[in-house]
Amino acid sequence: MPQYRSRTTTQGRNMAGARALWRATGMKDEDFQKPIIAVVNSFTQFVPGHVHLKDMGQLVAREIEKAGGVAKEFNTIAVDDGIAMGHDGMLYSLPSRDIIADSVEYMVNAHCADAMVCISNCDKITPGMLMAAMRLNIPVVFVSGGPMEAGKTKLAEHGLDLVDAMVIAADSSASDEYVAEIERSACPTCGSCSGMFTANSMNCLTEALGLSLPGNGTVVATHSDRRALFERAGHLIVDLCKDYYERENANVLPRSIGNKAAFENAITLDIAMGGSTNTILHLLAIAQEAELDFTMEDIDRISRYVPQLCKVAPNTQKYHIEDVHRAGGIMSILGELARGNLLNVDCPTVHSPTMADAIAQWDITQTGSAEVAEFYKAGPAGIPTQTAFSQSTRWQSLDGDRADGCIRSVEHAYSKEGGLAVLTGNIAEQGCVVKTAGVDESILVFEGTAYVTESQDQAVADILADKVTAGSVVIVRYEGPKGGPGMQEMLYPTSYIKSKGLGKSCALLTDGRFSGGTSGLSIGHVSPEAAAGGAIGLVKTGDKILIDIPNRSINVLLEDGELEKRRAEQDAKGWKPELPRPRKVSSALKAYALLATSADKGAVRDLKKLESLQ
């Protein structure tokens, strides 16, 4: 029988000192026989998706105590990608994922916690905590802070979000007053940005992985229904703890729940809902922590047969995450996938014996439960606030239209092929990714002329200076995990391309990555990256590039042997993977770059690189 990890510090005469310190935190004699559960919070006043989490940790802690456990809360960092966007702050975003994973490991292992409740929300926090959960492999439940309500203004007929503010700001035809109105209306409440951006995509994927409760990805942060998710998580983690440590049920551990079939479910959901391309990067990294053989090849294979069943901002202006919830949330998308025989329904979850059981209970098209129907009617109030659980607004009806609603059936899919695709070719030999859900059908096959920039800063300046014209393929290189370092998001360049009216006549190709708010012909994660010697570093301005999404290919159109000739010329000059532009890089980022892999490996640390330094 597995032993409670916490007994290392709470049992035996030699642990008198440790117990004395535990007592100083408020523990009493009877507590030393209970499981010690880490409440991993990520509250910060820097991030709207986390600004309301201050009291959530103690809410979960009180429920853990009611269920017979001891709760100990700690905090980890959280970077707001939107605020860090467009300047050197973005260099720190992706590396923060590893710091979050490490900090959770350090705290949980140093204090021998038995289990965790992870309170996450925004872009790198959920994946960082998922990496830690798989690394530690102790019972865990995820509960996120929830999505922001979509913005409302009389000046726009559709819901607003962060991207609207970015795009309109660069539109020279928009008045200062109009820009100010959009800015003030775009992000009205606490919560993760309201579209199917990276944060919400990842929180939705925790449902598909089986590590969170139904509704985790879609109940808006302001709604009173979200309180129950935190409360249930507190009770559930104690049950999972006892299942593992007292009943020897290893099926409740993260690696048992998050097996390869579950990861296939997660990427299937991601493709079906047109999620952020960042999710590919994160799923690859999380799978490596779980020691799973889950690769870009698996993602490419699945992307070829999964249809797009949901279309949400930034891929459309019609729907935001609050609309997905009204249509039945993630459980209803999973239900449609299951009916199309596209889902592994035998996977266990933290709350149900199998995914099939979960779908039967929570899919609004299957269940007859009035309680479930009421749950998915939880909607936005349209009142600006930073307070969680502050409103109880309900939609008058559910959106169960699977032919023309927010969520579609397989038979009525938005497209037969899903919202994400992996492309390969002579400038991306190990692959690159594109969110096809955000690409206009007219440019699924696109031949354009390369316009090469050596940094995001240069790309932004040239786009705003009208140096980029229709028919261009803007290449932004040396922005990968190693080259950046930190693999910056390119939301400003793609937003400015749209501002200039080039959204359907230009492409952007980078070894960096994109915000979940990006749409258009934006292709990222080119691997190998330029700083690792990738062929994207050999492209010259004026080269012709052919992008063929239906055939999953991307190539620079050169005579046979031309790339090899360019590489030989480059090598003859003594080329090294150094930055071809001035950029101040801290020692912390240099350490990250030293071990970072390219995006096709999840941009994780490769400790084998240390061997070459010894």
UniProtKB/Swiss-Prot annotation:
Q: Which reaction does it catalyse?
A: (2R)-2,3-dihydroxy-3-methylbutanoate = 3-methyl-2-oxobutanoate + H2O; (2R,3R)-2,3-dihydroxy-3-methylpentanoate = (S)-3-methyl-2-oxopentanoate + H2O
Pathway(s) the chain acts in? Amino-acid biosynthesis; L-isoleucine biosynthesis; L-isoleucine from 2-oxobutanoate: step 3/4; Amino-acid biosynthesis; L-valine biosynthesis; L-valine from pyruvate: step 3/4
GO cellular component term, pick one: cytosol
Q: What class of enzyme is it?
A: lyase
List the keywords (alphabetical): 2Fe-2S, Amino-acid biosynthesis, Branched-chain amino acid biosynthesis, Iron, Iron-sulfur, Lyase, Magnesium, Metal-binding
Matching InterPro entries: Dihydro-acid_dehy_C (IPR042096), DihydroxyA_deHydtase (IPR004404), DiOHA_6PGluconate_deHydtase_CS (IPR020558), ILV_EDD_C (IPR056740), ILV_EDD_N (IPR000581), IlvD/EDD_N (IPR037237)
**Binding positions (Mg(2+)):** D81, D123, K124, E489
Please list the GO terms describing molecular function. Answer: 2 iron, 2 sulfur cluster binding; dihydroxy-acid dehydratase activity; magnesium ion binding
| UniProt record, GO biological process | isoleucine biosynthetic process; L-valine biosynthetic process
Question: What cofactor does its activity depend on?
Answer: [2Fe-2S] cluster; Mg(2+)
Instruction: Provide the active-site residues from the annotation.
Output: S515
EC number(s): the record gives: 4.2.1.9
Q: Which residues bind [2Fe-2S] cluster?
A: C122, C193
Q: For the modification N6-carboxylysine, which residues carry it?
A: K124
Superkingdom to which the source organism belongs: Bacteria
Bound how, and how many: what does the cofactor note say? Answer: Binds 1 [2Fe-2S] cluster per subunit. This cluster acts as a Lewis acid cofactor.
User: What SUPFAM superfamilies does the database record attribute to this sequence?
Assistant: IlvD/EDD N-terminal domain-like (SSF143975), LeuD/IlvD-like (SSF52016)
Coiled-coil stretches? none
Give the function comment from the record: Functions in the biosynthesis of branched-chain amino acids. Catalyzes the dehydration of (2R,3R)-2,3-dihydroxy-3-methylpentanoate (2,3-dihydroxy-3-methylvalerate) into 2-oxo-3-methylpentanoate (2-oxo-3-methylvalerate) and of (2R)-2,3-dihydroxy-3-methylbutanoate (2,3-dihydroxyisovalerate) into 2-oxo-3-methylbutanoate (2-oxoisovalerate), the penultimate precursor to L-isoleucine and L-valine, respectively.
**Known partners and oligomeric status:** Homodimer.
Which family is this sequence assigned to? Answer: Belongs to the IlvD/Edd family.
Q: Which NCBIfam families match?
A: ilvD, PRK12448.1
UniProt-recorded name of the protein: Dihydroxy-acid dehydratase
Gene name tied to this protein:
ilvD
